[in-house]
Structures are given as C-alpha cells and as structure tokens.
Amino acid sequence: MSGLRISDPSKLHLKKELTHIRKVASKGLRDPGTTSSWKSPLTSSRFVVEPPASNNVEILSNNQLDSQFPSSRVFGNNGKEKEKKVFLYNWKTQRTSSEKTEGEDETSWIQASLNDDDDDDDDVSDARNGGDSCLEETRSASMIRKSGFIKKKSKELDLSIGRKSTAKARNFPSHHLHVASGLSVVRDESDETEDFSNSENFPTKVSSPLLLKLKRKNWSRSSSKFLRGTSKREDSSHTCNSTPALSTSSYNMYGIRNPSTVGSWEDGDDELDDDNLDFKGRQGCGIPFYWTKRNLKHRGGCRSCCSPSFSDTLRRKGSSILCGSQSVYRRHRHSSGRFNKQKLALRSAKGVLPLLKYGGDSRGGSSIGIGYSDDDLSTDFGEIDLEAQSRLDGRRWSSCCKSQDGEREEEEEGGSTPESIQSLSQKYKPMFFDELIGQSIVVQSLMNAVKKGRVAHVYLFQGPRGTGKTSTARILSAALNCDVVTEEMKPCGYCKECSDYMLGKSRDLLELDAGKKNGAEKVRYLLKKLLTLAPQSSQRYKVFVIDECHLLPSRTWLSLLKFLENPLQKFVFVCITTDLDNVPRTIQSRCQKYIFNKVRDGDIVVRLRKIASDENLDVESQALDLIALNADGSLRDAETMLEQLSLMGKRITVDLVNELVGVVSDDKLLELLELALSSDTAETVKKARELLDLGADPILMMSQLASLIMDIIAGAYKALDEKYSEAFLDRRNLTEADLERLKHALKLLSEAEKQLRVSTDRSTWFIATLLQLGSMPSPGTTHTGSSRRQSSRATEESISREVIAYKQRSGLQCSNTASPTSIRKSGNLVREVKLSSSSSEVLESDTSMASHDDTTASTMTLTCRNSEKLNDIWIKCVDRCHSKTLKQLLYAHGKLLSISEVEGILVAYIAFGEGEIKARAERFVSSITNSIEMVLRRNVEVRIILLSETELLNSKQTRQIAVTTSSYTESGNEIPMKRIEAIIQEQRLETEWLQKTPGSQGRLKPERNQILPQEDTNGVKVLKICEMGEFQENQSGKRMEHCPVSPSLLHNSNFTNNKDNLGYESESGRGVCSLLFCWNTQKSPRRTKIKGTSMRSRRSRERRFSLFSACARPRK
C-alpha cells in the first residue's frame, strides 16, 4: 500500500466513476446514527427503488471492487457481461402505488446520474469515506471476504492525508478511501440462488460488514488516527472518518433542507474553503473541522468514538445494523434559520432526540469492543450531542415510511399500544359489541344486521357526547369485514382484518370530521368521487364515518342524497350527530336512525369500579357515585374525571370530587336549606356568603337546592349525616304543612333561576331568594282546592280580637234542644260528622275530620250539648272573613249547626233566625265558604238554612245567660262588659250610618277585600245584640242599667210583643220614640191619639238625653 500515491496517474480514471457513486449514495443514504428514530431493519423488506426482475444479488469484496471499477461492468453467474446497475435499498415494507411512482422517478434519476459524464471533478461530497454500505447474508459467513491489507492501507492513508495539500485534494484516487468500510455493488443474479428469495420480504437477517470488522479489528485505534489526521488540516476539503459516508443532512416530507447543510448538488469547489458541516453538498458524520485536539483529548482513549453516527442505537443493536436510505424529495433552495429552529424545538418536544441522547441506557457494560461503558460514552459525547442537535434536521423515519413490522416500531417509540396510552378513555375504549355500555337495543340490532347481511347504506347515530357513537361505528366496520365464517360474534379479534382494526390500521374505514377545517369539503369531495365510480362487485365493505354531520352545508347533503338514490354496493355511510334538528328531514327518512341514550349512573359506576381495580386506584364508593352523577350520562366524561382525580396522587374521596367538579356538598346544602326555611336571616346570609366565597356558582347551587327539595318530597333522599336523619328532611316525618313549604320553596327557586341567568349580580339575588324561602305563609293560611279562595288576609282591629278572646274564655255552649227542622237529601247517602267532644278530632292539627257512616238516616239531629268544637270552628271562620260588616253579621245572627260529608264533599249548615238576615247572608256565600275552607283546609259546600223563631230565641237566651254568669265568675283579668258593649255600639252605629247615608260609600274608601251589599234597601237592617245579655242582675236583685236598643227592633211588632221575654224595657216607661235619629219616617196613624206628651217634658223629667228610645206610640 505504500506504493500507492494520490497522484498516481494509473488510478485517476476511477475518480469520475466514484464521484457518481458518491453522489447517488449521499442523496439516497442517510446516517442511522444521526437520528434517534432509526431502528434496526431486521424484518424490513421495503425498497426505495423497485428491484429488477431478479432479486438475487452478489456481494463483492473490496478487491473485486477495485478490479471491477475500471471497466465499469459487472458479471453474473452465467458469465455474461451486463450493464452495471447500482440499487439503493431501503429496508422497509412494500410501498403504495403513489410511492412506487416516486420510486420509478427516483430510479430514472439515479440512472441518469450514473450516465452523466459531463460533471467535472469539482463536485465533491463526503462519500469519500466509504459511503457505500455493504450487505451481507448472515447465514453464510464465508461470503465475507476479508482483506488482509486493510490495516496497512489505513495507516498509509493516514500518513498520505497528513502530507497532502489543498490543490492535490481533487486528484486523490477515490477508491483508496473505501478500504475502511468496503463498497458493495449489487448486481442481478439468477432465480436459482438459494440465499435470497423472490418474495416481497427481503432477507430477514443481515449484518453490516462495518460492524463485523469493528468486532474483529481494533477499530478504536485505527479510527483515532483518522481523527488525528483530520484535525491537522482544518481547511481540508476531505474528511476521513471511520464511518460510512451517510447523510447528516436529511430531507423532510416537503423537501425543505437546512441552509447550513443543504445546497445545490451542482455547486463547485468554492464550497471547500468553508466549514465542512456548512457545505451545501455536505453529507458527513456531523463533526465540524473546528474541533481541536484539545476537544478530542477530553475524550480520553476513546477519541475515535466521537463520531455522532455511533449513537446509543448503534451500541444497543450491535451487529444487526444496516444503513437504510430515504426517498429523495424535491429540493427547495429557500429556507430560513428560524424555520429550522422551530422544527428542531418541535422535534425535541415530541421526544425526537438525535445522537447520543440515550447513551446512559447501557445494556451489557461495554460499547462495540471499546473498553468504556455506555455511561462513560454518554458523558464524553455530551458536547457532540449539543453540536449535532443544533445542526441536524429532517423527519423521523417512522413518519415517512412504514414497515411491515410497524406495530413493533410503534411500541418502541411509544406508539398507540394500550400500554403507552395515557388517557383512560382511549385505553379502555370499546373494541367489541359486548363492551358497549348502556346501548343494548342498538347493539342487538346491529349484530343481527351483520349476521343476516341486511346492512343499510346510511346509518344515523344520534345522542349526547360520550355515549359510544363513534366506537359503535368502528366496531360495525370491523364486523362487516371480519373473515370469520362461523356463527361467532363479529368482530372476532384474531383474524387479519380484526387485527388491523385493533391496531388502528384498518384500510376499509375512513373517518371524517365535519367540525374540523376543510372537513366538509373532504366529505363533499369523497361523495363526488363515489358518484363517478362505476358499479363494481367487491368482497369488502368500505365504511365512511362522518362525525358532527349536522355541521355539513346543504350542498353536501344534496350530494349524499344523490348517493342514496343510486347507492353503491359494499359502501356504508355512518353519520354521527348530537343535534338531530339540524339534519335535513329528507336524510333522516332515508337512513336507519339509532338513538344513543345517556348511560345510567349505575352502569357508569360499574365501569369506573372496574377501571379503578385495573389501575390500582384507591377510590371511595361514594366518590364513584358522585362522579357518575356529575358525568350527566357521559361515560367518557366520567372516565376523564376519574383520570384527573387519579393524578392527584391521593385517595379519591367525595370532598375531592366536589372540589374538582366545583359543586357544593349535600351536607352544606342541607344546612343552608334548613336555615332558609327556619327564617334565620342572619345565619342564612352568613352561610350563603361562605359558600359563595369558596367559588360556588349561584345558579349551580340553586339547581342543587331544587334537586334536593324534589328528592326530599319524593322520599328518595337519604341523609348521609346522622343529624339530618330525624329532621324534617325525612319524608316519613314530614307533615302536610312541611310539604306545602317545600313545594312553595321549589316554586320560588324555579322562578328565581330564570331571573338569575340574566342578572349581573347573581350572588346578591341568590341570597335574596333564600331569604324569601323563610317568609312563606303559614300552613293555616295555605289555600287548597277552591277556585273561590282569596289570596290575602284583612287586618284585624282590636274590637274583633277582644270579642273573640272573650268568647273563647267564656265557654259558650249551644242549646240542648237546638236541632234543624228539616234537611232533605234526594237519593244521596249522607255520612254525618258529629262534632261533639267525644267523637270529633281536633281541627287545629291540620288533619281531616273523622267521619262515621250512617247509611240509614235521611235527616240528622245535632245535639249541641257541650259542642265546644263547633263554636271554635265558627269563631275561626268568622275571623277569616275580610269584611267587618260580614263578621258582625255572622257573629250576631249566624249559627254553625253541623258539618256533613256527602260523597267526599264537606257540607256546612249555617242557620239564621230571620228570612231577611238569611237573604242578606246568601249574598256573601262565597266569602263565607272561603273562610270555612281556610279553617278546615278542605273543599266545603255551604248551605244556609232558616231556623224557627222560638228555637233561635231559646238559643239566644241560653247564650246570654252563659255570658252573664261567666262575666261575674271570671272577674279580674276579664275585659269589662260595659267597655265591650260601648265599643260594639259605636261600631254598629257607624256601620248602619254608612249603609243608610246616600253617597257615603262613594266618598269613603272601602276596606281591603271588603264585600259590600249588592242591593240597596230602604229600611235599616242592623245586627242583633244576641251575645250580650240585655238584663243582668246582681246578687242584691237590683236591675242594672239598660243597654241601648237598636231602632229597628223598636219598630218591630214582634219585638214589642216579646219585649218582656227579651228583657228590653223603655227608660221612661212609655212607649214613645224621641224621633231623634229615628228612621221610622212614616207617620203612624196612632200618633194623633197621643195626648199630653211632649219631647221636652219627657226630656226634662228624665234629665238626660237618650239617642234611642221608644217611639211615640200609644201604650196598650
């Protein structure tokens, strides 16, 4: 080897041939060590260039290479001379038709480069270093022909490089640079060679001669000399590295290259004066020439291993590495440094770390025969990594071309295998029909359709998000193309098509999203292509899934409608939508529609419990229930919440779920509701502000309160806290009044929520709504079941309250002989309610009255003996009346006889003694009925009857005696009798004057809800004073002063005849009237017969003024 010189003229004729080979290799090959995504192509079988008809090749050694280059011809086994053809193989899977077209273009481009003889010697690339890789069959080790002069050759070459100059660099014989790696030339072989097959799969086990030689030789020592020789001449145009000439300048899918490493292939020698990494045709290992000896000495004894091409991938793979090639894309001259920086940052973010980033991952202790471990190498190569990372660009091989062993490649690079997926919703997504949850009807229908072959051309899946619509469409696609011929459930999961589906590589499924950019245009383009296709018979189904189809424009729907009119066989469309209203009716009527309902909370909890068990998550059972409740029927949302909670790194509890979702716990809501209903204003405001300060949403809290109240009313709520178990929240302990309060609160919350959504200050109005819950009407004033009830209560004056209180203390009793004369029922069975003290229930307890069956009685007799309940009911009914005039009328003349129940309706019988009073009371039946219903809280029918005069007077006398007796026995704290009589007198005179005076009702403002008489009367109809005794005697027998008598009674003949019985007596002893304020305008014919009497003389004798006295009538 010492005889060979660079300037040897006998070797100059090989330079041009080698230049073309270098250019081809540099354009087609790529250094596997400069990209972290490179993998050992042990099972790869895809070619960059289409191979010839014969796939058999023969590996030539370096000696054969030197002998073959002068003639530029190669010979096959048959001894015939053939044209030299150099093919560059990329060990990947078979390519598609479009890729094959590119491969043919690349083949013609490569052949054109080989036949180009016009290029001069200025085109120099870094393939001088043995850029052509060798292919070797591992089954036959004898095929590798060792050359014994490699070591000598490398030594002599190192010395020659040190003495060469820049001018002589261009004349250096290129074939001397290939001794370190060996160049293999592939040529055609016959089909009978046993070492290689004609199938698509290339040999599965191959090894690089470079690595074999590195194992057999002391590579580190020889290569270190190359590095030392390189560092002596930094301005040299040649680089003598120990690695093959592979590219550090890679191509991305768009052909854009880094301007620092990429340039025109036709540039000349003017580039040789720059840094070798900045050569526009540079394809070196990545180490710049400005690396000094000092930098190399820092690496110690392994300075020869500084080439970035020997990355961690090389050291792990060992001798099973083959250099691949990448498709040459169209080159662009325009690019920017900022673009490359962004691309580099993007690759770093994705985990694409070039060179020796993973050098610390040692697998055995030493690296390629060097006496240093991987950890030492990773430390030494740190500076190289930084330099190479800033200069390398390109695209990961796994994204450019896929191999047949793609699933293993994705597993190594963190692909889409279940073990590497982080999202629980994707990891546990349904893959078969039986894994779909909550959609039993849809699953059964689709399974039967696949089994019977009755598949529709268009399906429409409608339902909320997260219910399994897209997963069902994918499973349907796999089931249609499953190769299982038995009656097993499809998809089976183990045939080839099902395997591709489970790996996400199904060729028969196309998913389009109308919500994405240009999604609608893609759907329209697809339909346009399908409409132009001729009908053809196919064995496989093509399934097109259109997600968010309600976003498609009208013209796309028209295209789909045309497809439905003339559908193609084996083509199925699955339209998925969450808004069925925006899908045209014509489309809905022409497709099979499946409704995906919300998943039940119980099914969600079962699924979450299984996931938590598989993932070893510590979750409370109540927390899973709360997650399912807040998921709102979406299984995907529930799985997402569970994943978020699992990232907290602690036990998943109910409080943690509430904090994540942003809702208030039920315990706090119960406490707030109880405070609001109890009318505790201060505590309600304080508690509400505490919850709002924690970040709770007022609208959400209002919805929670409404849901809580509905659960309590329905009896479906179970209090978790013991202190609420016996409270009013328990449905069994709720009274009718409590239910009414809850219903009223629910109504207020529903109305306030509508106003709260449009309010700007939601917190304030939320608290105001809570305060309204405590101001609800009491159960006694709750109106139930009558269209005639009134909504407001009139204010009560002191006179009414005092009289009622006095009557309640006096213990009035009805007469023992009081009974209705006749109560007739035609054809109805009457059930009488006897309200005696022994047989009636307390009506104040808001319960219905007990009834007794009496199927034989057509009339009823009420014994009023000791009937305190009847009196209490009647007093309460009178108190409920809004008109003071009506109150006085009922209290003075009315009497509650009985309450009967006829066919479920209560009938109250009210008796009056006079026909005129009865007629007047009948005009106020609605008000009387309303007041009685408010007391009894039942629908009541009021019937007014007329009692005989004798019975009424006897009842009055009995009541008067009772009042007189009780007034003396209960002296002390009782109200004075005279004061009560004076107040009643003033009130009745005022009422009578208002009713009689013309226009007084128009001038005076009536009371609230006062019911005035509807008819005008000429005579004055005043109330009788039946409660107070007219004659009261003390123990000495003296008669008390007489009470004033109503003028209407004085003009009543019946009253005059029975005056003695009633206890009325004229003050003067004469039956004359003072005519002052007397409404008896008619002159009596008897007045002319009165003699010797005058008003003045009478007044003078009586020495006092009497407003009302007996009218001037002759005494009998």
UniProtKB/Swiss-Prot annotation:
Under the heading InterPro entries, the entry gives:
AAA+_ATPase, DNA_pol3_clamp-load_cplx_C, DNA_pol_III_gamma-3, DNA_pol_III_sug/sutau_N, DNA_Rep/Repair_Clamp_Loader, DnaA_N-like_STI, HLD_clamp_pol_III_gamma_tau, P-loop_NTPase
Motif PEST 2: chain residues:
402-422
Q: Where is this region: Disordered?
A: 95-138, 225-244, 777-798
Keyword Transit peptide found = no
Task: Locate the transmembrane regions by residue number.
Answer: none
- List the keywords (alphabetical): ATP-binding, Coiled coil, Metal-binding, Nucleotide-binding, Repeat, Zinc
What Pfam family does this protein match (any one)?
DnaA_N-like_STI
Q: Where is the composition biased (Acidic residues)?
A: 115-124
Q: Coiled-coil regions in this chain?
A: 726-760
Which residues are Zn(2+)-binding? C482, C492, C495, C498
Specify which residues bind ATP according to the UniProt entry for this protein. Answer: G463, P464, R465, G466, T467, G468, K469, T470
GO terms in the biological process aspect are: DNA replication
Keyword ATP-binding applies: yes
Which ranges are annotated Polar residues under compositional bias?
A: 778-793
Annotated signal sequence range: none
**According to the UniProt entry, where does the motif PEST 1 sit in this chain?**
257-282
Q: An example Gene Ontology cellular component term from the record?
A: DNA polymerase III complex
Q: Any idea which GO molecular function terms this record carries?
A: ATP binding; ATP hydrolysis activity; DNA binding; DNA-directed DNA polymerase activity; metal ion binding
Q: What family does this chain come from, according to its entry?
A: Belongs to the DnaX/STICHEL family.
Q: What is known of its domains?
A: PEST motif is known to mediate rapid protein degradation.
The protein's name in its UniProt record: Protein STICHEL-like 1
UniProt lineage:
Eukaryota, Viridiplantae, Streptophyta, Embryophyta, Tracheophyta
